[in-house]
C-alpha cells in the first residue's frame, strides 16, 4: 500500500464526509462497503464521482470515504465536495475546471426550522378574511 494519500473534507446538509485518495486502480469504498452497494442509486453514484470525471482521473485513484449523518442524497453531496477538495491537494491544475463546474462550493442550503404557531416552517392554516 502506498504512503501517498490526499485528504478532503466535505459537508452537505447534516452529512459530513472524510475522503482519502490514494494512487490505485479506481476502487471506491464508502464506510468499508462498495460505493454502488452503499448509495444504491446510479444517479447518486454519478453525483459523488463528478469531480473525478471532470478532472479526468477515473482509474487513477482508490477512494476511501467515511461518511456520517443525513440521508443518501446529502451524503453523496458531501462525498462530492470531499473528493473535489482532495483532488486540489493532488494538483492545483484541477482548480479551474472544478470551480467552473461548481464542485468547490459548499452548498449552504439546510432545512428551515419549524416556527411556533405554524404547521411546518412556512405552512400555516388557511386564512379566511370573512
From Swiss-Prot:
Recorded GO MF terms = RNA binding; structural constituent of ribosome
Pfam entry (one): Ribosomal_S9
Query: Could you state one GO biological process linked to this protein?
Result: translation
Biased composition (Basic residues) is annotated at 111-130
Highest taxon in the source lineage: Bacteria
Keywords from UniProt, A to Z, are: Ribonucleoprotein, Ribosomal protein
Q: Which InterPro entries match?
A: Ribosomal_Su5_D2-typ_SF, Ribosomal_uS9, Ribosomal_uS9_bac/plastid, Ribosomal_uS9_CS, Ribsml_uS5_D2-typ_fold_subgr
Q: Name one GO cellular component term.
A: cytosolic small ribosomal subunit
List every stretch annotated Disordered: 109-130
- NCBIfam families, alphabetized: PRK00132.1
Q: Which family does it belong to?
A: Belongs to the universal ribosomal protein uS9 family.
Name assigned to this protein = Small ribosomal subunit protein uS9
Amino acid at each position: 500500500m502506498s504512503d501517498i494519500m490526499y485528504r478532503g473534507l466535505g459537508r452537505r446538509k447534516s452529512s459530513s464526509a472524510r475522503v482519502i485518495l490514494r494512487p490505485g486502480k479506481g476502487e471506491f469504498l464508502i464506510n468499508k462497503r462498495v460505493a454502488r452497494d452503499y448509495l444504491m442509486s446510479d444517479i447518486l453514484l454519478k453525483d459523488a464521482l463528478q469531480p473525478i470525471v471532470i478532472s479526468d482521473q477515473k482509474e487513477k485513484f482508490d477512494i476511501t470515504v467515511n461518511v456520517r449523518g443525513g440521508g443518501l442524497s446529502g451524503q453523496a453531496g458531501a462525498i462530492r465536495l470531499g473528493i473535489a477538495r482532495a483532488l486540489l491537494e493532488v494538483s492545483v491544475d484541477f482548480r479551474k475546471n472544478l470551480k467552473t463546474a461548481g464542485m468547490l462550493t459548499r452548498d449552504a442550503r439546510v432545512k428551515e426550522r419549524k416556527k411556533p404557531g405554524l404547521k411546518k416552517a412556512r405552512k400555516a392554516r388557511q386564512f379566511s378574511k370573512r
